[in-house]
Structure formats: C-alpha cells, structure tokens
Regions:
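Catalytic histidine neighborhood in serine/cysteine hydrolases
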Residues: 483-500
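Catalytic histidine-centered segment of alpha/beta-hydrolase-like enzymes
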Residues: 499-508
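Short alpha-helix in the alpha/beta-hydrolase fold that links the catalytic acid
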Residues: 457, 471-481
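Conserved acidic catalytic loop of the alpha/beta-hydrolase fold
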Residues: 208-226
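N-terminal cap/lid subdomain of alpha/beta-hydrolase-fold enzymes
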Residues: 39-60, 101-201, 480
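Alpha/beta-hydrolase fold catalytic core
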Residues: 323-469
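Alpha/beta-hydrolase fold nucleophile elbow
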Residues: 223-235
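A catalytic-pocket lid/entrance helix-loop region that shapes and gates access to the active site
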Residues: 146-149, 244, 248-335
Length: 521
C-alpha cells in the first residue's frame, strides 16, 4: 500500500523545517520601490558559480522567460514588548551563472534590515533550512523573522495562517537574510536540461551556489565589513560548515559564527549498519516515553545517556549471537521506551525510527511524530501490517506555513512571482546526489577545518529532546569527538524540551533568541 503523496513527501525529507488575511501588524503601508531590473546580474567572472559543463538550454530569451521579477523594497514597523522595530524589507533574487556566463538559476532572497543601524557594526545573518528541498520559511516564520506563525501542538492543517509580530525576532540584534535554494520557495532554474539540475541538486553544487549567493549579497549591499553569521537547520547541519569553509577558502569571505538548529552532522551515525544509530536514538525515544507522564528535561535523561554510552553499546556490539546480552538489552530498552517487551525482544532491542513510531501507542491506533515524537496522531491504516503513515508533527504544518509564506511575500512584501511556492519540495530530495561512496556524507571534517582556520569563530548548536529525525544525542556524540583545542569555549550545545522545531515553544524560542544574541555580543 503506497504512501499518500503528502505523506511520501514528508517522510522523504530530513528537515522540518513548513490565502492568509492581511497581517495584523502595524506595518507602514508604502509604495514599493522596485530595484532596477536585473541590476546585479552582470556576468562578470567574479559572479559565476563553479563551472557547469552543461548541455542546458540557457539562451537569454529563455532565462528572461523563466526569471523572477525585480526586487521590491518596502518599509515596516512592528510593536513588540518594550520596543518598536522599524525596518526595511527587500524581497527579490540573485541570479547565478555557470562558468560560461550563461544564466542558470534565480535564487529567492528575503532581507530585513533594521533602520538607522550602523552597517559597519551591525551583524548580518544568512539563514537556510535543509531537506534537501526545504525553503527557509521554517526558520523565518517559526523562529527568527519579524513575523511568525504559531506552529505549536494545537495547529492542524486547516488552522488560519495568520502571522503575528514576533517578540523573539533576531532582528533585535542582527539583520536577516533568508535564502531559498533552487527548487524551494520561489527559487527556480532559468536554464533547462539535466546537467544544470545535476549540478545544483548535489552536495558540492549546492554548497557552491549558497556561498556565491552570500558573497554576492554582501557585495551588492556593501556589507563585507559587517560581522557575518550563518544559521542552518537539519540538513543545514551539512550545509552550514561546508558553506563557511567555501566562503573562507574560495570566496574570500570570513564568517564570525555558525548557528546549527537541530542539525544532522554525520550520516554515518544515523543510517546503514552503524550500531551507533541505536545509541543515538535511545535517549530521545526514552524522552518521548517519559514526557507522557510529565515534563522532561535533559537532566532527567542522565541515566539513559549513561546507559547508551556504556552497557547498551557493550551488549549491542556482542551481537545477537550472544542471546543473554541481546535479551538483557531488549528488556532494558523495553523498560526505557515503553515498547512491549515481546516486540522489543523480537527486534533485539534495535528500533529504527519508523518501528518506534508505529509501536509506541499501537494499541490505541496512534503513531508518534518523527520531527517531534511527543506529538501523537492517528494511524490512517492501523489494520495494515505495513507502516503507511505520515508525520503528525509536520504534516499539519504544511498548509498553514505555505499559505503564510505566500501571503507574506505577495501582499506584505509586495513581491509577486509567478508559479507555486515550494515549502517542501520532495522532488529535490528524490533527485539529490549525496555523493554516496565509501564515505557517507558528513560535515564534521569541515567543522574542524573552519574552527582551525579562524580561532575566533563561534559555533552554537541546538536540538530538541523529542526529535527522532535528528536525535540530539547523536549530535552530542559527534561534538564530543571534537578536539578540546578547537571546541573548548567556542562550541556550545543547548538542548530544549521539544522536537525538531523546538522553537515552536515560546520559552524555547526566547531562549534561542537569547543564546544567539549572546553569541553576537
């Protein structure tokens, strides 16, 4: 029985990142000021991405037919507790070219600049989500932007997509630039053909494109001297360190800090035959079970973290050939997660995420979320032997977030591209070239390198206790392998009671705001 299209899209993504009435902010309604058409699209060598040996059709006529409209700038003001923020928003795009100077893609970029700030001292932060295939709406409308959409546990697909002023906006202390990689948001190819897609829908092509967009924005806005930060969520944990490395070594741009939200840093620990994947997930699965009885903090999971590092791994390594060790492990995992002992023994205490989601509350026909295991939803096929369910913690957010992003862009920011807005584009993930080979994809190598290249670089890593897509303990295990000479006092890891989008919680969102602000002081 196949997954529904909606469930298939969500299940294929590694990120969560997600007709709205007129915004109820006190935005100052002004005439939009369009930028000169394609003013920044000169085909100089400095503005080219890595060479694409392309068979793409990239004629000027075709490029203009597919292109995004000129940039639009508007003025706004929002009243927040204890302060009012006046700012300038620009919605538009940056065009990318191949090594022949042929147009390849228009990358949608949304910028917010605080009015009256000195650009020499004012930080600027570039934000992107993951997927691959996710737009930046998750971070913009969920955590950092001047407006946000409530995405808490009460949200359902039909919830009104009404934005509100974001009291925890990062605009308090940094200008914001949200980037939608090609195929997400309104970003699109202006050339056709398989080669251009293969270039951008691949790890290295994606990294190169993101780095060039950031450099181009800095040049266009005369902000190369400003403090510069990057923030990425989920697969953004792969993008983030690699983009910083590209900026440092290929674009000639230094970066002051990197913020990683619920990141995946190393696929080796979360997939395939790696035994570490079971240790990485166990604390989050236990957190899901314990929160059913009351609030859970990371301190409450000290016992399971200790077990996951020690006896659990010892028994796991002994393998199923050691029946005593396997039974001992399975029974302990059953006690920690609440999964029936018979099921745990049948699976030898080795739960993958889908099995845990299905078995946790199977008697009542419910499944857990993947991005937030604490969110339970109905199993659409409880009578099936297979697992044919979506993600109750993410599926319900797609409609309201998409509608909110469209209305914000088209009505409030007055930028009106043709075509659909892609919040989560499953076709991007399906076509993505992860560069599979002997070495699975990871960014810890680049994390070490960027920390070594710049001894002043700061890194803030965050995660959610109930995140089953990017388990916090897996991140902890990766960070623990960093040499103290690189990580001490420079890499900070903060874990919140929440899921992948832990910032849906008011207290967590405020804490994230404060952590990022402290980092930029």
């Amino acid at each position: 029985m196949p997954l529904s299209p909606r469930s298939a899209v969500t299940a294929s993504m590694l990120i969560a990142a997600l007709a709205l009435p007129q915004l109820h902010s006190n935005a100052i309604a002004q005439e939009a000021r369009p930028a000169a058409p394609h003013a920044d699209r000169a085909k100089s060598a400095a503005e080219q991405t890595d060479t694409v040996a392309s068979k793409a059709e990239a004629s000027p006529a075709r490029a203009e037919l597919n292109s995004l409209p000129p940039d639009v700038t508007t003025k706004h003001s929002i009243a927040l507790p204890g302060r009012t923020l006046a700012f300038t928003a620009t919605a538009g795009s940056i065009r990318l070219y191949n090594g022949k100077g042929e147009p390849q893609a228009d990358i949608a970029v949304t910028t917010y600049k605080l009015d009256g700030a000195d650009p020499r001292n004012r930080p600027v932060t570039f934000l992107f989500n993951g997927g691959p295939g996710a737009s930046s709406a998750w971070l913009q409308l969920g955590a950092a932007g001047p407006w946000r959409l409530p995405i808490g546990s009460s949200v359902v697909a039909s919830s009104p997509p009404v934005l509100q002023a974001n009291a925890e906006t990062w605009l308090d202390f940094t200008d914001l630039v949200f980037i939608d990689p090609v195929g997400t948001g309104y970003s699109r190819f202006v050339a056709s053909g398989d080669e251009v897609r293969k270039h951008f829908y691949a790890v290295e092509g994606d990294i190169s494109a993101m780095a060039v967009v950031i450099r181009r924005w800095l040049e266009k806005n005369d902000r190369l001297a400003s403090p510069k930060y990057l923030a990425g969520e989920s697969y953004g944990g792969i993008r983030g360190p690699k983009v910083v490395d590209n900026l440092q070594t290929k674009q000639g741009v230094g970066v002051n800090g990197l913020i990683l939200v619920s990141p995946v840093l190393d696929f080796r620990d979360l997939s395939g035959s790696s035994l570490l994947q079971y240790a990485a997930r166990l604390p989050s699965m236990t957190a899901v079970a314990r929160q059913q009885k009351g609030k859970v903090t990371r301190a409450d999971l000290a016992d399971v973290e200790s077990y996951a590092r020690s006896e659990f791994l010892t028994d796991l390594v002994k393998g199923e050939a050691d029946k005593e060790a396997t039974t001992r492990l399975a029974d302990r995992v059953s006690a920690l997660t609440g999964i029936d002992k018979t099921v745990s023994r049948r699976l030898a205490g080795r739960f993958d995420t889908r099995e845990f989601q299905r078995e946790f509350d199977r008697d009542r026909g419910r499944v857990t979320g993947r991005f937030d295991g604490a969110k339970l939803g109905l199993d659409p096929f409880p009578d099936s032997s297979g697992s044919h369910f979506g993600d109750p913690s993410a599926d319900s957010l797609i409609a309201p977030l998409t509608s909110a992003a469209v209305q914000l862009t088209r009505s409030t920011l007055n930028w009106k591209p043709d075509g659909s807005y892609e919040l989560l584009n499953g076709s991007v993930a399906e076509q993505w070239d992860f560069g599979r080979g002997r070495q699975p994809l990871e960014s810890t190598t680049q994390l070490r390198e960027i920390l070594s290249v710049d001894p002043s670089l700061q890194v803030l890593v965050t995660g959610g206790l109930f995140d089953l897509a990017a388990p916090y303990f897996g991140t902890q295990m990766v960070l623990d392998q960093l040499p103290p000479t690189l990580a001490e006092k420079r890499v900070k890891f903060v874990v919140y009671p929440g899921g992948h989008m832990f910032y849906a919680d008011d207290a967590a969102r405020q804490s994230l705001h404060d952590e990022v602000k402290a980092m930029m002081k």
